[in-house]
Amino acid sequence: MYKVRIRGIFATALTKLALEWGFKIVQPTGKILQRFQIEADYSPPDLTVKDHESKTGVVVLGKCEAFESFLQRLGESLDPIVARARAGVKEVFSGKAVGEHEVEGPRGEVFKVPARYVLTPGGTGVFTVVKPPVGPVSGVAAPEIAVEGDYVELNTSGRVTFSEHIPQEDRLRLGILAETRLKQYASIGLRFKSSAKYADEEQIIKEAEVLYRELLQLSHGGPPGAVLRRGNCFAVVLFDRRSKEVLDSARASAVPTVRGHHALRAQGLGKCLDLLDYTGADVYEKAVEFLSRGPVLIYHVKPWGEVVKMKGEALGVKNGVLVVKRPLKPGGVLDGIGVRIERGFYALTCIPRDANYVVHTYYDGSNNVVGTYININTTPEWGRRVIYIDLLVDKTYAGGVEKVLDVDEFEKYKEYFPQRLRNPLQLAPSGRLECTAEGLVVR
C-alpha cells in the first residue's frame, strides 16, 4: 500500500479518491482527519500531491512506483492533462559541460546551470537535478551532489537548511541535533525535510549514516551521461472543467459541496465558498459573472504548467461572452500576425462561457482592426482570474489571410493530452470571428 500526502484546494476530493484506490493517507491535516475519520499516520510519504501555481491542477512528486500507480488512477478517473518530467527531481548524473552555464546529461538532455557556478566547457563532473525538464522548459542542474532520504538530504552545499514546512520550534530542536550528533554531516551539507519534524533522533541519525556512505560512492562519478542515482518522478497534472466536475462529485460524497466548487476555490473565495457549500446554493454562473468585473487576470496555462498572465479590464458580459480590454506594450510584434506594436495599440479579448477558444482582436490607436488571434483551449473559467489550458494550436486572421499555427508543437506534446483533446482544430470556431466591445461578431 503506497502512502500519499495530499495538500491544497483539491485535498478533500483527492483524498476521497485515493482512499477508494487503496492508497494510505499520511501526514493528514486536521480537516482531513475530521472528514474521513482515518488513522493519524505521520510516517514519511511515498508520494506528495499539492497545488500547481495556477490552482487548476496539481504537481505529483515521489517514488516512481507509487507515482505511476497514482497517475494511472488519476487518468482513469479524471482524464486530465499530464506532463511528465524527463528527469527525476534530485536525480544525480555524470555530465559534460557544453557551455559555462549548460551541461549535457542523460539521454542528451541539456540542463541550465545556475549563474553562481561557472563550468569549463568540455569538463565533466557530477550534477544533481534541481528543477526537472518538462515540455520545452529546460531543467536546471547544479554541480553538487545531493542524496535524499525520508527525513534528511545530505548534499555538498556546506550549509544546514530546513524545509519551509518545518515550524520554528522544530527547527530549534533539529538545529541542535545538527550541531551535535549530526555535526560531521552538517559540515558537508544537510537539509531537514518536512517529515523530520515527526521523526525521533535515532531515525534521523540512522538515515544520515546510510546517505553519507552513498554520497561518498557517488563522488567517484561515472561516464558522461550516466544516471548515478535515480531521482523522484515528477509530473504536472492539469484539470479542465470535465475533470473538476468529477472532483466536485468526489468531494460532495464526503462533505457538502456546491457545483463548481473547485473552479470557485481557484478564485480565492475562502470563507465565502465555505458558506455556499454549507447552504447548498447553486449559484456558480452568477458567482463567476459577478467576479468577472473590473480588473481581471487571464491565466493562459500551458499543458506543461507554465503560466502566462495577462492583465485586463472587464468591459462586461456581452451576448454571453466576457469581453476584456488589454493594453499592449509598444515595441514587440504581434505573435502570428507579424505587425509591430505601436503606441495606443490594445486588444479586446472575448471569452465564451462554454466554448473551447478565446478570441483576441488587436486594434491600433485609431481603433482600426490589425488582426485576430484565436487561441484553442479548454473551456475557460470566468472570474477575477480567467483560467484556461492552452491546446497549443491557434488560428490567425490578418490582411485577409487565415493561418493555422503551432501544429508541429502540438504533435510534439500531444501525449500530454487525453484522447478527447487530441484534435484541437475540431474545437475551433467556424467563420471569421472578431472580438468587439459588444462581443463576438462574424465577418
Swiss-Prot record:
Superkingdom per UniProt: Archaea
A Pfam family that the UniProt record links to this protein: DUF402
UniProt keyword annotation of Magnesium present: no
Key word rRNA processing present: yes
InterPro entries reported in the protein's UniProt record: DUF402 (IPR007295), FomD-like_sf (IPR035930), Ntdp-like (IPR050212), RNA-bd_FAU-1 (IPR016730)
EC category: hydrolase
Function according to Swiss-Prot or TrEMBL: Probable RNase involved in rRNA stability through maturation and/or degradation of precursor rRNAs. Binds to RNA in loop regions with AU-rich sequences.
Family: Belongs to the FAU-1 family.
Record protein name field: Probable ribonuclease FAU-1
Species assigned in the record: Pyrobaculum aerophilum (strain ATCC 51768 / DSM 7523 / JCM 9630 / CIP 104966 / NBRC 100827 / IM2)
